[in-house]
């Protein structure tokens, strides 16, 4: 699996995902599915990680927590393979938030710490601040 030069249609879909996240779950999932199908065809880890991460995030905002772990779990390998460290750290933060909501505090701490490890290693100050804020609440 590789990172490929992304065609304009995929770049447009990715931009739509970034711009409309949190506003229209059905459209977000459709955009992500289109990206995922294309990425599967061409073997693009970067796009697969992106699509699964944003699907997971959309499911979180829709309160479908079981699907969050399914999508984020799928995303993590692709995100790491393609070096999308900010999304890796954000994935761990999201899994921690869901774990807190389910009362699994020990898992939440592990996820927060994993996210912080990536933040420190790759100097991801914004994500690090979000994780630290979540840890403090």
What is the predicted function of each stretch?
Residues 14-21, 50-61, 86-101, 112, ...:
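Conserved alpha-helical positions within TPR/SEL1-like repeat arrays
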Residues 1-23, 43:
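N-terminal alpha-helical interaction modules that lie
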Residues 37-51:
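Short, charge-rich amphipathic alpha-helical segments embedded
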Residues 28, 34-35, 68, 74-75, ...:
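Tetratricopeptide repeat
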Residues 7-8, 42, 46, 86, ...:
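Residue signature of alpha-solenoid helical repeat architecture, marking inter-repeat boundaries
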Residues 64, 73-83, 104, 113-123:
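Tandem repeat domain/solenoid detector
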Residues 39, 59, 79-80, 99, ...:
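Eukaryotic all-alpha helical interaction scaffolds
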Residues 26-29, 66, 86, 106:
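Residue register within tetratricopeptide repeats
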């Amino acid at each position: 699996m590789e990172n490929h030069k992304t065609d304009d249609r995929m770049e447009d879909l990715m931009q739509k995902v970034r711009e409309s996240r949190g506003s229209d779950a059905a459209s977000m999932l459709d955009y992500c599915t289109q990206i995922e199908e294309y990425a599967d065809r061409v073997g693009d880890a970067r796009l697969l990680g992106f699509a699964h991460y944003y699907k997971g995030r959309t499911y979180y905002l829709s309160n479908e927590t079981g699907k969050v772990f399914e999508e984020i779990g799928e995303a993590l390998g692709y995100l790491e393979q393609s070096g999308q460290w900010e999304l890796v750290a954000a994935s761990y933060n999201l899994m921690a938030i869901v774990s807190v909501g389910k009362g699994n505090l020990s898992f939440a701490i592990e996820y927060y710490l994993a996210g912080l490890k990536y933040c420190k290693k790759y100097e991801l100050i914004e994500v690090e601040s979000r994780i630290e804020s979540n840890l403090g609440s």
